[in-house]
Amino acid sequence: NISFAQQDPHFSMWYSSPSLLNPASTATMEQDVTFFTNYRAQWLSALPNQIRTNAVSAEIKLGNDRLRSGWFGLGAQYNNDATGDAQIMSHIVSIPFNYVWEGYEKSYFSLGIKPGVINRSLKAQIQTWDNQWNGIGFDNTVFSTESSSNKNTHLTVGAGMYYKKLYRDGSKFDIGFSANHLNAPEQGFRSLSFQTFRQYIFHTSGSIKLDRYKFLLSPQLITMFQGPHRDVIIGTSFD
């Protein structure tokens, strides 16, 4: 029997850089330029080779001082995963791009796309294989007949829509939908390639200013559907 697994980045703190999941939310912030970076290391005490995730992104508004109806948003993103003893690694470079229409009384609607390139690799020579078993253990000096390096590179495309409303009292509301891997790029190596599941994301959040109690209530919701997998994250913060 042959089993298949897929690797794809997931961010639970999407509100820190929403364009990582929805290209339509690129450059919808109040600032003209933003920068985001994230580093995560997992299973430090359990595994000799830790699971590591890196993310870097930057966004900029274009034409907001010249266009009457809104502005263009442009971003650049880089994601990197390094996993386990086999050194399975992925590099993802994406360029989200959108247009934001400014509506009545600080309401905004945008459509965006995100083309990208995915590169994946693993080192087969540092693993153990069935023909290296000598009856007692695995002998790494025996040639495994496996390729010393496996790599693949594919294009991926995402798209989304986004709406945001700002209120005079400082409250706000936003909602969005996006779809990633629309072209279902291949994963796997050599003859064991298979298509990546398309990812569908719905997200909404808000900030409710309570002057009476002098704090801000910010509920958040995101749902992610990808093949047989479902993720639902609900939370809120108080400021």
Regions from the PLM with identified roles:
Residues 1-4:
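C-terminal segment of classical bacterial N-terminal signal peptides
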Residues 6-239:
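Subset of outer-membrane beta-barrel
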